[in-house]
From Swiss-Prot:
Cofactor: [4Fe-4S] cluster; [2Fe-2S] cluster
Annotated residues for binding of [4Fe-4S] cluster: 16, 20, 23
EC numbers: 2.8.1.6
Subunit structure: Homodimer.
Alphabetical list of NCBIfam families matching this protein: bioB, PRK08508.1
One Pfam family matching this protein: BATS
Domain (Radical SAM core) ranges: 1-227
Record InterPro entries: Aldolase_TIM (IPR013785), BATS_dom (IPR010722), Biotin_synth/BioAB (IPR002684), Biotin_synthase (IPR024177), Elp3/MiaA/NifB-like_rSAM (IPR006638), rSAM (IPR007197)
Gene: bioB
Protein name in the entry: Biotin synthase
């Protein structure tokens, strides 16, 4: 079995005007995360080279904020061109919030392979975690991404206080979108966040992966944020549960597993690493 590894570069961090209750990048909460408007492009290229060295196939360019404006779009396209010039064989993923058809067309022209815009949770539960934009705006952005020919990376976050009915509704919406890959994140409590929820139990987290694979049999199920914190020593059981992709290295504002540990463990388990999209 091949495992797809993806790395993340937080190319514009913090200061987001949205009020998502689970997110430390929101300007509505005081957190000690690293904040910057633009990361130096040379630094991003170095990170892309490291991602490639760490067996990553996907490299995700993430910007904080509600969505794209002209300036941000131009910057993301410049980054995409620079990475492609210096690093071969990486599939570029853009994660830049709410976007329209024209913006997504520009990203595709710049060499972006896939657009990541998570629904996060069910349509019904979403107003409990965010009031500054709607679930429908997220869903529509995904439809636009598909329309322009971008592959779709769409998932969400569990452990926000949602019910089992919410989880089923959320996965039904994902099934409707039929994404190429679907990230599963697990909420990590933070004293500065307005949302107060305990960590999910490892068994519950593994069952979420199983249920997601059942509902999205054709998608790469990617276990992302919270993997190490929630599952701890059981984190490599995710592959038996149906996952076929993980984030390698650090996340947006939290530390990830050491890439060398992930790579060594996966090799010991008999896995190889995806080097092309299939």
């Amino acid at each position: 079995m091949q495992i797809m590894l993806c790395a993340i570069s937080n190319i514009a961090s913090g200061g987001c005007g949205e009020d998502c209750k689970y997110c430390t990048q929101s300007a509505h909460v005081k957190t000690n995360i690293n904040k910057y408007k633009r990361k130096d492009i040379d630094q991003i290229v170095l990170e892309a080279k490291m991602a490639k060295k760490n067996e990553a196939l996907g490299f995700c360019l993430v910007t904080a904020g509600a969505g794209l404006d002209d300036e941000k779009l131009e910057y993301v396209c410049k980054v995409a061109h620079a990475v492609q010039k210096e690093v071969e064989g990486l599939l570029l993923i853009a994660c830049n919030g709410i976007a329209n058809l024209e913006q997504l067309k520009e990203l595709k022209k710049a060499g972006i392979f896939s657009y990541n815009h998570n629904l996060e949770t069910s349509k019904e539960f979403f107003p409990n975690i965010c009031s500054t934009h709607t679930w429908e705006q997220r869903f529509q952005t995904n439809l636009y991404a598909k329309e322009v020919g971008l592959m779709l990376c769409c998932g969400g976050i569990y452990g926000l206080g949602e019910s089992e009915a919410d989880r089923k509704s959320f996965r039904a919406s994902l099934k409707e979108l039929d994404p190429f890959s679907s990230p599963i994140n697990f909420f990590i409590p933070n004293e500065n966040l307005k949302l107060k929820q305990a960590l999910l139990d490892p068994d519950e987290a593994l069952n979420i992966i199983k249920d997601t694979k059942k509902d999205l049999p054709n998608a790469h199920i990617m276990v992302a944020g919270g993997r190490e914190v929630v599952l701890k020593e059981r984190q490599y059981e995710i592959f038996d549960a149906g996952a076929s992709a993980i984030v390698v290295g650090d996340y947006l504002t939290t530390k990830g597993e050491e890439p060398s540990k992930d790579i060594q463990k996966l090799k010991q388990m008999g896995f190889s690493f995806a080097s092309s999209c299939h």
